[in-house]
């Protein structure tokens, strides 16, 4: 599961989101969602606080595109890679600026890379 938490939102929910992802996924990839005005690393610290470091596999990658590609490249036949949080959004908000970004486009490109070796 690729998961993050939005910036300038309820910090108390972030560890809960990390814990929920870990309970329901074999591998958790923590990444940026829409950090808005917050430091993306601080947001990931908050989400990671909900993880049990002894349980399961997880990694941390601030760059959402890199995180999505890594999750897809690590997937094996029969795996389901869930890319959570942003859904249909076509932007990522960083430092108050909405930059073009699409989970769907990144995932399609990563799947094409895997398919063509």
Task: List where the protein language model places each region.
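ATP-dependent carboxylate-amine ligase
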Residues: 1-117
């Amino acid at each position: 599961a690729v998961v993050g938490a939005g910036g300038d939102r309820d910090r108390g929910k972030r560890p809960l989101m990390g814990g929920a992802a870990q309970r329901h996924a074999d591998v958790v990839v923590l990444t940026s969602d829409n950090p808005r005005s917050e430091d993306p690393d601080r947001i990931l610290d908050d989400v990671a606080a909900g993880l049990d470091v002894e349980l399961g596999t997880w990694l941390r990658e601030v760059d959402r595109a890199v995180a999505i590609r890594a999750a897809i490249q690590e997937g094996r036949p029969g795996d389901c890679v869930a890319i959570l949080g942003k859904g249909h959004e076509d932007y990522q908000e960083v430092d108050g600026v909405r930059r073009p970004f699409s989970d769907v486009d990144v995932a399609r490109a990563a799947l094409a890379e895997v398919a063509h070796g």
